[in-house]
Amino acid sequence: MLIPRPYQQDAYDAALKHIRTSKDPSIVHASTAAGKSIIVAMLAQTVKQANKRTLILVPNGDLAAQNADKFREIGEKPSIYSASLGHKCVENHAVFATPMSVLNNLDDFGEEYALIIADECQMISENLESSSQKLLTHFRSINKNIRILGLTATPVRFKTKLVSAGSTFKSVCYSITSEQLASQGWTVPYSIGVSDSTYSL
């Protein structure tokens, strides 16, 4: 049985509350090593229990497989849709996919999805003609009430904020930084250089 860390539970709770109360896309900012795949799995499981579908978008096939494995760990069956992995399945309630594989095969995604989770959401372009915006437009045309949740360890895009009035994402519903992870004992604090006691010439 997978037991989430306290901050993972907090992130899940905050994201679920936002999804249930607002149509505005929001972000979970979770630093590297926070275990975002667990948060994703918990959210997708909750949506499945409501007999609805989740599309989880990740940058590459390896991450699709890793996130799908985490979903299996909590006793659920994922689908994977990634050309690089040779898998194009949408039969289960949670589909882990790469954006271009979806965009190139939109006819396979005609069913209504309740939630899109976009990992590494800082990569989503604000250009309305971009592939990412075309993808979001497709799913919004099927379900005008679809919820969109972004996950990122980097809440900026090319030195600009991800969250603003004119951007895709309107808020950050939860945040945990690398400093907070270290102070809570989940990670080792970053250090630069090598101590004199371990370095000699």
Positions of PLM-derived features:
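Conserved RecA-like ASCE ATPase "motif II neighborhood" in helicase/translocase motors
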Residues: 94-120, 124-135
